[in-house]
């Protein structure tokens, strides 16, 4: 597994950042190039070096040198289409996990790093825990959970759609350099898959799905007493239904609801101000804990309100399902999904090719 330190090797994802702060993340290949608006970065200039170095895009003189060294590429030069500017500098770093999540290929919409960080913190997800996740999507949350529990823990992920499971699996493999051994990725309906899991075997459950209130029975069966359930939802209607379902079940503690807003700042001398743009609402986090069997959660007495029903209470089950379909946030065209899967298959295949090349090089040296 890639330790993500030491010399940079082929197959890794690397982040190039210019003086203006513009970032480009690309997978390195022997003899490969990264196209930029300021010229070309030659991957051979990066492979074997350490993080923190600065590389310069190809100039006309360097391009002529590369052509002379590799005449077989004359008939198919990927840098022909690039503006021949050259001389632009980029800092070389391995991407942070937050950067990787935002740049990785997507089959479904992802959770923002600000929400993922709160899931890890509020869910008290740490090394050695056994975690159950529902809704892999593109793998953003999965990769962060894998990182949080570490090799001493274990993550089980349930994803309804096989194509999304493939995307999540490939993104995690690319991040770690190989498929994480402490991850069990299952496809199918949450209730059906969870029914085959041992009782009270999970310390934490993370739900990222449209109807988490319909999954509470199986979630309670597999979570350990005192375990934390945390759900990510995007609308107030979903949030209200989940909270009321948790209260009605009786064996979940009073739900805590949180929304995170993120704003960055600029500081230049004494000129300090917030950025004009910010990341506002992306979703709600609902957190609750499981009571032991036979014990009901303690509730405070709330003053009764006039509003005891909602518009959704008057809907038929079919109408409610139609509303869920309208809330579908993971919709993606088949064409785009096929393209994402092709790109990921190509990138993961490079990992095995580069690994074989390294082994052959070591054998030759011996």
Label every PLM stretch briefly:
Residues 3-6, 10, 17-26, 30-32, ...:
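C-terminal lobe and adjacent flexible extensions of AdoMet/dcAdoMet transferase-like proteins
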């Amino acid at each position: 597994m890639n330790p993500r330190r030491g010399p940079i090797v082929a197959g890794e994802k690397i982040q190039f950042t210019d003086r203006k702060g513009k970032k480009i993340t690309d997978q390195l290949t022997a003899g490969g190039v990264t196209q930029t608006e300021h010229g070309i970065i030659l991957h051979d200039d990066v492979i074997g070096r350490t993080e923190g170095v600065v590389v310069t895009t190809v100039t006309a003189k360097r391009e002529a040198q590369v052509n002379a060294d590799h005449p077989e590429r004359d008939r198919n030069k990927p840098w022909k289409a690039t503006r021949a500017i050259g001389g632009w500098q980029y800092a070389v770093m391995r991407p942070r996990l937050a950067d990787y999540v935002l740049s990785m290929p997507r089959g479904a919409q992802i959770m923002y790093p600000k929400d993922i960080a709160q899931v890890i913190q509020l869910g008290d997800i740490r090394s050695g825990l056994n975690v159950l996740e529902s809704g892999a999507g593109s793998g953003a949350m999965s990769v962060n959970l894998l990182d949080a529990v570490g090799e001493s823990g274990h993550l089980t992920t349930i994803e309804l759609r096989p194509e999304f499971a493939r995307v999540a699996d490939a993104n995690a493999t690319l991040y770690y350099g190989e498929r994480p051994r402490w991850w069990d990725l299952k496809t199918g309906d949450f209730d059906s898959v969870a029914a085959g899991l041992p009782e009270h075997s999970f310390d934490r459950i993370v739900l990222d799905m449209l109807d988490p209130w319909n999954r509470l029975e199986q979630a309670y069966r597999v979570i350990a007493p005192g375990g934390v359930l945390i759900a990510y939802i995007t609308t107030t209607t979903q949030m209200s239904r989940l909270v009321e379902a948790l209260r009605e079940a009786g064996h979940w503690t009073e739900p805590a609801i949180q929304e995170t807003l993120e704003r960055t700042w600029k500081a230049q001398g004494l000129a300090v101000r917030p950025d004009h743009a910010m990341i506002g609402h992306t979703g709600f986090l609902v957190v609750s804990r499981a009571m032991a069997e036979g014990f009901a959660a303690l509730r405070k007495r709330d003053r009764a309100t006039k509003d005891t029903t909602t518009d959704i209470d008057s809907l038929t089950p079919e109408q409610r399902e139609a509303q869920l379909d309208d809330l579908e946030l993971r919709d993606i065209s088949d064409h785009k999904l096929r393209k994402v899967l092709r790109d990921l298959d190509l990138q993961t295949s490079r990992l095995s090719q580069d690994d074989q090349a390294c082994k052959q090089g070591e054998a030759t040296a011996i």
